[in-house]
């Protein structure tokens, strides 16, 4: 459960991230594909090379969805309901991949905002991404 402090931390970080959605999203996907190459299997129809238009576009979509979750932080389940349906029933993404993506996003945020990425902020972002992952896998059951 996200505390009021966690929510404030997430919103504070997102205020810095939101101006870089395409760049950070693409970097997150690039990092995920490099560190966890098995995740590429869900993107066989994409050019998964660094800087590709498809990766930049999808990275931005991911970040926009996370922005929706931040903007509806008190009701993430409703904000991401359609996306949860899509990932569970159409794309059939293995739920473990959400954790891998979350880890890569935390690394990207820490790399670009090292002074902002305190241990408390790290915990808050990790909890937020865990909540997002739980919501996105909730319809798998």
UniProtKB/Swiss-Prot annotation:
Belongs to the globin family. Red blood cells. Involved in oxygen transport from the lung to the various peripheral tissues. Heterotetramer of two alpha chains and two beta chains. PROSITE patterns: GLOBIN. Keywords: Heme, Iron, Metal-binding, Oxygen transport, Transport. GO terms for molecular function: haptoglobin binding; heme binding; iron ion binding; organic acid binding; oxygen binding; oxygen carrier activity; peroxidase activity. Residues 1-141 form the Globin domain. InterPro entries: Globin (IPR000971), Globin-like_sf (IPR009050), Globin/Proto (IPR012292), Hemoglobin_a-typ (IPR002338), Hemoglobin_oxygen_transport (IPR050056), Hemoglobin_pi (IPR002339). The lineage of its organism: Eukaryota, Metazoa, Chordata, Craniata, Vertebrata. O2 binds at residue 58. Heme b binds at residue 87. One of its GO terms (biological process) is hydrogen peroxide catabolic process. This is Hemoglobin subunit alpha-A. Coiled coil: none annotated. One of its GO terms (cellular component) is hemoglobin complex.
